[in-house]
UniProtKB/Swiss-Prot annotation:
Has a role in mitochondrial fission. Has a role in outer membrane fission but not matrix separation. The gene is FIS1. The chain crosses the membrane at residues 125-145. Its main location: mitochondrion. This is Mitochondrial fission 1 protein. Pfam families: Fis1_TPR_C (PF14853), Fis1_TPR_N (PF14852). SUPFAM superfamilies: TPR-like.
């Protein structure tokens, strides 16, 4: 069983020359693109910075997952990783959880699970902070506007 890379390894983009080689091979094979070539190209897309390129990588991995039972393990991990990088934490968790249900001790998947959990918790806290900030601002504006408009009316309008 091949070892999967850690999620942090996917944060380092390939250099343009490496990307060009894989792109040329993928394009050369055209409609008859081989499974390994498609997988390599999808993998490199996940490591390429522009969002559209990463989305294409996830799409290619999903295609491979559907047609190749022997590549599903790798695809699950990379689909989880790709969705994590795109900020689709629910999908990332779904794919990673499937892999962990089959391989509970998979260190790379456990590492990815930690990263997903950290991002979800961080973004959840940011969401709470934003909502709290809006409520505080609404309260301040409401109190300042009270003489002219009525505090409750202003607070209700700002919070809805």
């Amino acid at each position: 069983m091949a070892q999967l890379p850690y999620a942090i390894d996917a944060e380092t983009p390939l250099n343009p020359a490496e990307l060009a080689v894989l792109r040329a091979q993928y394009e050369r094979e055209g409609d008859m693109v081989g499974l390994q070539t498609k997988f390599n190209y999808a993998w490199v897309k996940l490591n390429f910075a522009p969002l559209m390129e990463q989305q294409l990588g996830v799409m290619l991995l999903a295609e491979i997952f559907r047609v190749s039972t022997e590549r599903r393990r790798e695809c699950l991990y990379y689909l989880g990783l790709g969705n994590y990088k795109l900020g689709n934490y629910g999908d990332a968790r779904k794919y990673n959880d499937i892999l962990l249900s089959k391989e509970p001790g998979n260190l790379q998947a456990l590492n990815l699970q930690s990263l997903i959990d950290e991002k979800v918790a961080k973004e959840g806290l940011m969401g709470v902070a934003i909502v709290s900030g809006v409520a505080v601002v609404a309260g301040i504006v409401g109190e300042c506007a009270a003489p002219e408009f009525g505090a409750e009316e202003v607070k209700t309008t700002l919070l809805h």
